[in-house]
């Protein structure tokens, strides 16, 4: 690792990039997503969308305010994008949602609607005055009622980030697995196994191909009977 860069061969496995074309790749800036669960905007634009051939051209495009992430202009080429973020390029009327594939890597799926985003509640914080702060998987924080539980998901209207819908984490919920050997698979929660030890809870998920079990923290609620946002196919 060197300053704002890291070696391509050491880049997270979630990044769908070639490893031997050059030695270095931009390191994502600290922010909403971890390095393993996010990637720098320059990688998205240059390596995945191929809107330019090199970092200098990408920096120019970003400096001109031509790229939005979740409805907001982003100009830092190292800005971190991750799961269910939406990248928009108004000049070509294009929107893409970041999803995890069954290969364990990030993919960009074209979408027509960039006005909604699904977020997972990773934890809650009790504030003074009895207020509750929701902490979401993309770093968003917001004040809400205590009706929301950790591991539930909410649909946010973008770019104002206001809650529009709420999906509970429970038996029957439609979920996507975001990590592990079942990464990218979608199914319904059949059983939640609570472990009375330091080991993680597990979830049994049913799909048309059969049932499988995965770690609870790998599960992301995406709707009830069908995915609640574009770009995710059950």
From Swiss-Prot:
The keyword Cytoplasm does not apply. GO terms for cellular component: cytosolic small ribosomal subunit. GO terms for molecular function: rRNA binding; structural constituent of ribosome. One of its GO terms (biological process) is translation. It comes from the Archaea. This is Small ribosomal subunit protein eS4. Keywords: Ribonucleoprotein, Ribosomal protein, RNA-binding, rRNA-binding. Belongs to the eukaryotic ribosomal protein eS4 family. SUPFAM superfamilies: Alpha-L RNA-binding motif. Residues 39-102 form the S4 RNA-binding domain. It comes from Methanocella arvoryzae (strain DSM 22066 / NBRC 105507 / MRE50). The gene is rps4e.
